[in-house]
Amino acid sequence: ASMSGDDGYMTRYSRTAKDESSPEVPLTTIVAKLKAKGLKLGVYDSPFWYHYTNPNAVIPGTDGIKVSSLAYDPAKDKDIKHPGSKDQFGWVVTDHPGAEQYFEGFFKHYSDLGVKFVRMDFLSWYEDGMNYTDVIDKGYGRERYVKGMQWINKYAQKYGVYVSLVMPHLRNNALIERYAGNMVRIDADALEGSWYRFSDNNRGSLRGGWPNSENAFDGFINWSKISGRKKIRLDGDFIRIGSYADDNEKMSVISLPLMAGGPISITDMPTGNDLKFFQNDEMLALNKDGFVGQPLERNLWNTDGEIWYGQMKDGSWVIGLFNRDQAAATRSIDLTKVGITGTWSARDLWKHADEGTVSDKIEAVIPAHGCK
């Protein structure tokens, strides 16, 4: 795919058809087609990247500063982490003149197009050039990274753009990412999907840099420490529903992001029986409510990390019992431990069935990789 434009910002995108040689299409055309269907366009782009076919394009709001001047200059940019490494992208060096105006122009450009969602990737490569211990890129340093994040916060708010941050190191408990973004990735890429990527891959291991967790379940448990209503949303990456072995796994991969307050990001084309997992209105009501749950304990091995709870705006409580194990197992929660007292009517949100009343305790046998 190619992302290109004549003024330093993306105005055209290729690969809009299943054809390697499909022509570039103006974003305005894509926006119009989606609008006719009642849909909105989100883009994959970053103000840390520059796109140009015209290096002499002038940055908006500057006195003739060219977009090409934002690029790395070995003659003056001396404090780079890995100067001998090859840049994987055209990075904007944020202490170059015109960089802030370029960032503002980025958000204005998309806002003017009617694009209100931007997903920004490879942030760790900009900050220090690293994938945990592997050197990938030059790395422009924490100071330049923080400066760019401050501008993202400032101008995304000014132009009403929702910011999705991908591949950050999340240092200092995601201090700068919580400030700058609306949503943040908390685990390694879903890649081919499957329960292995969702729950088993390197389970129980936390790192100090990207990716902090190798599976989404660990990521949601660990980073629940920064989530909550009107706080940054946790993004467990895309859902390849067709990669899961059975209905139990499919219900779990939909339920956990919703219990954690995260998005449901459809990746493959759900057909036949798989479509229903994305159409459960009772589960999707959590997303509409702004619900954000928490695990009983932020523990990657103890079953308390598999029991989630939270409260809806109407005062009702949602309990999620999960089973990461290879065999059926009992999961239970003492309701008084989370401040729930009295007798409550119970309903199964996947079966769409009332289940009488509960008080004091909820307990159920959960199938392998399943939930309730």
Regions found by a protein language model. Name each.
Residues 153-352, 363-372:
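Active-site-proximal substrate-binding groove within the catalytic cores of carbohydrate-active enzymes
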Residues 1, 43-45, 106-136, 163, ...:
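Short acidic catalytic loops
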Residues 94, 126-152:
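Active-site cleft segment of glycoside hydrolase catalytic domains centered on the general acid/base Glu
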Residues 2, 47-51, 122-127, 168-171, ...:
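Solvent-exposed loop/turn segments at secondary-structure junctions
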